[in-house]
A protein has these predicted regions:
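Glycan-recognition surfaces
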Residues: 166-171, 183-185, 235-353
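Mature N-terminal, pre-catalytic/accessory segment of carbohydrate-active enzymes
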Residues: 2-46, 52
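Carbohydrate-binding surface patches
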Residues: 335, 341-344, 349, 385-431
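Aromatic-lined carbohydrate-binding/catalytic grooves of carbohydrate-active enzymes
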Residues: 65-129, 133-201, 205-207, 216-217
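C-terminal beta-strand-rich structural cap/linker in extracellular carbohydrate-active enzymes
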Residues: 456-479
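Catalytic cores of secreted or luminal carbohydrate-active enzymes
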Residues: 335-384
């Protein structure tokens, strides 16, 4: 059942409040590791469709996912924000005429329903097709309760409470004004979240990305509890990442993924964002919980945002970054981008349009060695830095003399560097920090991107690295 009353008349913007943080949470459970024993692999609609994914595009991407990504271990197909938005459209098109929908589709309990604008057939056919193909399906949710539900004061399912009883009307997301936060101290608050996530469980959703949540520990706990109360295993992904703080790891570990960067796009500066956050969170991933460096903006992006409508430039900015385009990173920068995700054991969520994906992008995100490093599940650590050359290492689980190295050139010009075994931290005696075997053994090396193999001797080797490029190596001790 859909209720159609606009939320635009509710005041917004000026009353955004700081996170509501309780001091009452004293013990925190951890998520079940078997839900994400390795970094999740999948596709998310945001980079290519913003918050305007529609039914036909979803189905086309799902079929392309099955053909192009699933054979390589990719599993999660995720519909991002907007699937419940009743958008105003440019006449005769599916292009949006507003950044975020003014109206939302809700049921009588104030719970989200698929949009009649973009999902007139519902999302059940997409869910069923994903499961038929052996894939898992995810949706995006915002923290809190729809402001429309509060205005209508809808009942909280299974209780005598109503939406207005639990809303924290001073807590509004800065970039999407659909919801109020929840006052977690109020009776009915947990019950509301229970009902929202039980509905997703009944739809057979497998993955939930919850946005505007990371700065709100109490609501992280409530949503994690709601998922556990739903009776269905659903992977929980926390977003966005601009305020992620290692001190809050006990809360984040109620989830399976936590964004550690702000939005990442096809810009060289965003490579620096990823490096900087990786440094902070290095070594913190483990089975069931993975720091997330955001989606992979390869291929066609922002497809619902052409530069002009009917020859007239837009007078408002839509969601995401920029207009319709092909990824603007160079081929070398793309190698660096995906190598970071591989060595960091970050979840890999492809963002570009899959039906139109170019062969080069596909070759990077399906490379067996890259995925082997990522799925090894050891979050890489920084072992060397000098003159803007950084070396990151991820060792193979239970095999200290095997692993992967990324030699990154973070300079604005190409560099030639000569590195020895000590620089690369190769040949360290197991269970010691910096005690090298004597003599240091030779290592077999595979240059993953340049498709070369060689023996690395302790004395060293020179590497030529493009600006913002990488040498990505798999290594193992030579016999």
């Amino acid at each position: 059942m859909s209720t159609a009353t606009a939320i635009g008349s509710i005041a917004c913007g000026s009353s955004i409040a700081a996170p509501f943080v309780s001091t009452k949470v004293k013990s925190l459970k951890y998520r079940i590791p078997d839900l994400a024993p390795k970094p999740p692999l999948g596709w998310n609609s945001f980079d290519s469709y913003g918050v305007y994914l529609h039914f036909d595009a979803a189905m086309a991407n799902l079929e392309a996912f099955h053909q192009k990504l699933q054979p390589h271990g990719y599993e999660y197909f995720v519909i991002d924000l907007g699937w419940y938005g009743e958008y105003s459209l440019v006449e005769g098109t599916l292009f949006p005429n507003e950044k975020h929908a003014t109206d939302l589709s809700l049921d009588k309990y104030g719970l989200l329903e698929p949009s009649h604008t973009y999902f007139s057939k519902g999302i059940k056919p997409i869910i069923d097709r994903a499961h038929e193909l052996g894939l898992k399906i995810g949706v995006h949710m915002m923290r809190g309760i729809p402001r429309k539900a509060v205005k209508l004061n809808t009942p909280i399912k299974g209780t005598d409470y109503k939406a207005a009883d639990i809303a924290n009307i001073k807590s509004i997301c800065e970039w999407c004004h659909h919801n109020y936060g929840i006052n977690t101290s109020k009776p009915g608050a947990q019950e509301y979240y229970n009902s929202a996530y039980k509905k997703l469980a009944d739809w057979e959703i497998d993955f939930v990305k919850v946005d505007d949540l990371i700065p709100y520990p109490d609501e992280i706990v409530m949503i994690a509890n709601a998922i556990e109360n739903s009776g269905r295993k659903m992977l929980l992904s926390l977003s966005p990442g601009g305020t992620t703080n290692p001190q809050d790891l006990p809360y984040y570990r109620r989830s399976n993924m936590v964004r550690i960067t702000a939005d990442i796009w096809d810009r060289r500066d965003d490579l620096d964002k990823a490096f900087n956050q990786w440094r902070i969170f290095q070594g913190m991933g483990s089975p069931g919980f993975w720091p997330d460096l955001d989606m992979i903006p390869f291929g066609n992006l922002q497809t619902m945002q052409p530069a002009e409508y009917d020859g007239k430039k837009r007078d408002f900015r839509l969601s995401g970054f920029g207009s319709k385009r092909i990824c603007q990173l160079t081929k070398e920068e793309m190698k660096t981008f995906i190598t970071i995700r591989s060595l960091a054991a970050s979840p890999i969520m492809m963002g570009g349009d899959l039906p139109t994906l170019d062969d080069y992008s596909l070759s990077l995100i399906t490379n067996e060695d890259m995925l082997g490093c990522n799925q090894n599940g050891q979050t890489g650590v920084l072992v060397y830095e000098k003159d803007n050359i950084e070396i990151w290492m991820a060792k193979k689980t239970d095999e200290p003399m095997q692993g992967w190295l990324g030699i990154f050139n973070r300079n604005e010009s190409p560099k030639t560097v000569t590195l020895n075994a000590e620089d690369l931290k190769l040949g360290i005696t197991p269970n010691t920090r910096n005690v090298f075997e004597n003599p240091v053994p030779d290592f077999k090396m595979k240059d993953i991107w340049n498709k070369d193999e060689f023996i690395f001797h302790a004395g060293g080797k020179s590497f030529n690295i493009p600006d913002y490029g990488v040498i990505f190596l798999a290594f193992e001790k030579a016999n």
